[in-house]
């Protein structure tokens, strides 16, 4: 019995060039889960965005890239390899084959499923690697996978499908977060820990608050597991895409507000991402870090009820890297897969 596991993440362009970014961005934005406007309107909007936006983002991709390629893709490939090793080392009568797929770009969901078909897998586990169940992302992954599986049915392959919608409540994931934060940051009096998640449309949350509830629960667990006062661990959301109503408060504004209130030590962790990407690396660890470190912090002492500016002291900023290949994360993924197929 061979169980196929598809580890699915959002994706990345093939290269940090305008020529590579345009088709990637177009595929991303044309997904009705991302932009729900009727097709003709969506196509017109996307055509306009794609004609302009890559010129503004290509420098960020170039800054994120390394000579070896996309760090996000490299980490994702390692995760798939480690998960396959972990699954097979803990299995007596099953063989697991893990493939990596991206919802947008390469390697595609279609190519991943074809690889599992050729391996004659008897069951398929779809595992979008979003710890919290964000419908826009995971839902789109499931829909695309089932669309491609429908095509493969014509070749006589119709295995049972197991969908994993979240794994934020698996203890191994919680423990991995605790260890990761503790490794990179130590709380001192006056510190604040900002727990930042990818934002999503407020209209989606009103229909189904599962994602928001799981983000809140994760923030609460982090505070409890680290023994921090709840008021020192702040929930926020990053990377809103346009002018529509998005889930807030926004991370950048939260950090600015903390500086205005005299906080001089800020740590940001992004538990919703299992691999560092352009959002975490550029928006948070570069741009937000530069803002914090180049804005004079305020003293904890106040004058007349207002924090006093100390030009000789600047705020410190810590970014906790994504879990990546952390053994605790791999164990959480292994447990999620075995639970789904037991």
Language-model features and meaning:
Residues 1-342:
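Active-site-proximal alpha-helix that buttresses catalytic centers in soluble enzyme cores
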């Amino acid at each position: 019995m061979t169980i196929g596991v598809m580890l699915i993440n959002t994706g990345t362009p093939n290269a940090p060039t305008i020529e590579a970014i345009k088709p990637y961005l177009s595929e991303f934005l044309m997904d009705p889960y991302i932009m729900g406007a009727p097709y003709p309107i969506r196509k017109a909007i996307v055509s306009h965005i794609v004609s302009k936006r890559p010129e503004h983002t290509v420098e960020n991709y170039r800054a994120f890239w390394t000579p070896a390629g996309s760090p996000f893709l490299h980490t994702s490939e390692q995760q798939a390899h480690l998960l396959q090793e972990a699954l097979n080392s803990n299995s007596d009568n099953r063989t697991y084959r893990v493939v990596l797929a991206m919802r947008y770009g390469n390697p595609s969901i279609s190519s991943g499923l074809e690889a599992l078909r050729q391996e004659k897998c008897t069951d398929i586990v779809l595992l979008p690697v979003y710890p919290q169940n964000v419908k826009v992302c995971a839902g789109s992954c499931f829909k695309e996978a089932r669309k491609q599986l429908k095509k493969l049915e014509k070749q006589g392959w119709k295995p049972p499908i197991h969908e994993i919608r979240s794994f934020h409540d698996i203890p191994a994931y919680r423990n991995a977060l605790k260890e990761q934060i503790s490794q990179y940051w130590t709380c001192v009096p006056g510190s604040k820990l900002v727990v930042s998640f990818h934002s999503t449309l407020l209209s989606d949350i009103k229909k189904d608050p599962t994602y928001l509830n799981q983000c809140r629960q994760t923030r609460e667990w982090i505070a409890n597991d680290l023994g921090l006062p709840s008021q020192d661990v702040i929930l926020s959301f990053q990377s809103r895409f346009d002018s529509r109503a998005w889930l807030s408060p926004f991370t950048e504004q939260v950090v600015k507000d903390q500086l205005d209130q005299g906080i001089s030590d800020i740590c940001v962790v992004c538990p919703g991402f299992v691999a560092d990407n352009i959002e975490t690396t550029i928006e948070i660890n570069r741009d937000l870090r530069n803002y914090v470190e180049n804005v004079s912090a305020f003293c904890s002492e106040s004058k007349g009820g207002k924090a006093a500016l100390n030009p000789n002291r600047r705020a410190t900023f810590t970014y906790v890297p994504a879990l990546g290949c952390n053994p605790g994360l791999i164990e959480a993924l292994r447990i999620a897969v075995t639970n789904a197929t037991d």
